[in-house]
Every structure is written in structure tokens, then in C-alpha cells.
Regions:
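N-terminal membrane-anchoring alpha-helices
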Residues: 1-58
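A short C-terminal boundary segment appended to hydrolase-like catalytic domains
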Residues: 3-14, 19-22, 206-210, 264-280
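Beta-strand-turn-beta hairpins that frame and shape the catalytic cleft
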Residues: 51-65, 148, 156-170, 247-254
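Membrane-embedded segments
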Residues: 58-151
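Active-site metal-binding loops of divalent metal-dependent hydrolases
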Residues: 66-72, 96-99, 130-132, 154-155, ...
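Binuclear metal-dependent hydrolase catalytic cores centered on His/Asp/Glu-rich metal-binding motifs
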Residues: 141-149, 154-155, 160-199, 205-206, ...
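Conserved beta-sheet core of the metallophosphoesterase superfamily
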Residues: 202-276
């Protein structure tokens, strides 16, 4: 009689252990998901100061608000606008991916109103990101209605607060095969003005190495949405420039933002950000 009882106890113990492990795994998954959603909601406004003459030679002192990768997140977009209104920049740049390719983008009044608020602060312009091409007509209509230009292989000459001319060039998306630098850029050494280049993916810099530009602003990477909590670095499998300011050939610089939104609404040790870039 002892053997069946012992066997029953063993089976019950195994069931208890199995259920316990399942609950532990489930709790871990839910906890991880909660952490990811929480981190993705913690928008930071980060400032960086760069020497003007080594970044945009001849442009003079300048304050640029730069944000990218909204990914249809109206709440974080409103937070971004509030930070920018407080910072009072001279120029506002959007680096692409206003939407998410797999989400609907139908009720767009929040986007139009937000872009209009930004335009009331300072001159504002942007570019398309790879996700935007899935909803290109809607995105372009939103920006047009708000009066904010989207540069797609085009350039504008903008008068800086110092009275100098800054050439701002915006490219179509590199990953979508829509970038055409030959339409709007000159060969190295041919530009008469400092050039601020807007390109959604920082990896496109290699294609642009023989064109004349000084400072490139990019997004796209989200800094991998994953950070190393021990080193403070970011883990990205698709870019050698996940986030921050990098030196490039010919004394040029590339600045990559971590972005505002995120894919699947989760980040780990990698908070979203907008950037205030001070050139002094």
C-alpha cells in the first residue's frame, strides 16, 4: 500500500513544482512587459552642446530641437511639444517615422494640431522615415495641412539668428530606395553654405560620403530599444551608430537620436528622448 501512496505524493509534488514554475515564468514575463512599457513612457529631454565652428562652420550660435520616430504615439508627441515650447529653439527638425507601418493612421487631428503648435514656436520641417511610406499619403497630408514642409530629396536655405545662411537638405528614405542625393546635394567642397543634412537612417552616411555636408541628423535606430544597465551603452543589431554624436570622415558629425516612440511599445534600459542641440 505504501508504493501507490508514495507515487501519488511524488506526482503531486511534480504538479506543484510544474505549476510553481509556470507561475514564476508567467510572472517574469508580465513583469518584463510592465518594465518595457514603463520605460517606453519615460520621455527625456536631453541637451547636448557642440562647438558651432566644428559642427556647422559659419552658421553661428544655434539651438535646434530634434525629435524622431513618433510612431503614432499621440501622448508622447504632446510631451515632446511641451518640452520644445519650453526650450524655445531657433529651429525644429523631425527625423522621420511619424507612424507605424502596421497601425491605422486615420484620426489625425492630434498630429495636425501638434505640428501647428510646433510651427508657432520656430521654423519646423521634417523628412519621411521608412514606416511613413506605408501611410505616405496620410502623412504628407497631415504635414501639408499643418503647414510644415517635408523635405524629400530637396533643400531650403534658412537664415540663421546670426544672419548667415544654413542650407538644410532632407533626403528620401535610404531603406525604401527613395534617397536621391544627386538631385539636391553637391560634391565635396562645392557648397557655399554650411549644410545640415536630414537622413532617417544613419547607415546612409556611407552612400553620402562623397557629397558636401557638415552635420547629419538621424533617427531610425531607437538605440535598439535595449540598453546595458551596467555600462550605459545601447545594444543595436542594425546600426553601428545606435545613439549619440559621432565623428565621420572629413571632420563631419552624425547625431542619432533614440527617438520618441517605439515598436511594440516597449524599451528596456533605453528611455525615449527628444534632443536640444546647442551650437555655441
Amino acid at each position: 500500500m505504501k508504493c501507490p501512496r508514495l507515487l501519488t505524493r511524488i506526482l503531486n509534488a511534480r504538479k506543484t513544482l510544474t505549476y510553481g514554475l509556470l507561475l514564476l515564468v508567467l510572472g517574469g514575463i508580465l513583469g518584463l512587459k510592465s518594465l518595457g512599457h514603463h520605460t517606453a513612457s519615460q520621455l527625456e529631454c536631453n541637451s547636448i552642446t557642440l562647438p558651432a565652428e566644428q559642427t556647422l562652420p559659419g552658421a553661428g550660435a544655434l539651438r535646434i530641437a530634434f525629435f524622431s520616430d513618433i510612431h503614432n504615439n499621440a501622448g508622447l508627441f504632446n510631451e515632446t511639444i511641451a518640452h520644445i515650447e519650453q526650450a524655445r529653439p531657433d529651429l525644429i527638425i523631425f527625423g522621420g517615422d511619424f507612424v507605424v507601418a502596421y497601425q491605422r493612421f486615420m484620426r489625425t487631428s492630434w498630429a495636425v494640431e501638434g505640428l501647428r503648435r510646433l510651427s508657432a514656436v520656430a521654423p519646423c520641417m521634417g523628412i519621411l522615415g521608412n514606416h511613413d511610406y506605408e501611410k505616405q499619403e496620410q502623412v504628407e497630408r497631415v504635414f501639408h495641412t499643418a503647414g510644415v514642409p517635408l523635405l524629400r530629396n530637396g533643400a531650403v536655405d534658412w537664415k540663421t539668428p546670426a544672419g548667415t545662411t544654413l542650407r538644410i537638405i532632407g533626403l528620401g528614405d535610404y531603406n525604401e530606395g527613395d534617397d536621391a542625393p544627386e538631385r539636391c546635394m553637391k560634391a565635396c567642397g562645392q557648397e557655399e553654405h554650411p549644410v545640415l543634412l536630414l537622413a532617417h537612417d544613419p547607415e546612409s552616411r556611407w552612400r553620402l560620403r562623397n557629397y558636401d555636408w557638415d552635420f547629419m541628423l538621424s533617427g531610425h535606430t531607437h538605440a535598439g530599444q535595449l540598453g546595458n544597465p551596467f555600462t550605459g551603452t545601447y545594444i543595436s543589431f542594425r546600426s553601428s551608430m545606435p545613439a549619440g554624436c559621432y565623428d565621420f570622415e572629413g571632420g563631419r558629425r552624425v547625431f542619432v537620436t533614440r527617438g520618441v516612440g517605439s515598436i511594440l511599445g516597449m524599451r528596456f534600459f533605453c528611455t525615449p528622448e527628444l534632443n536640444i542641440i546647442e551650437l555655441k
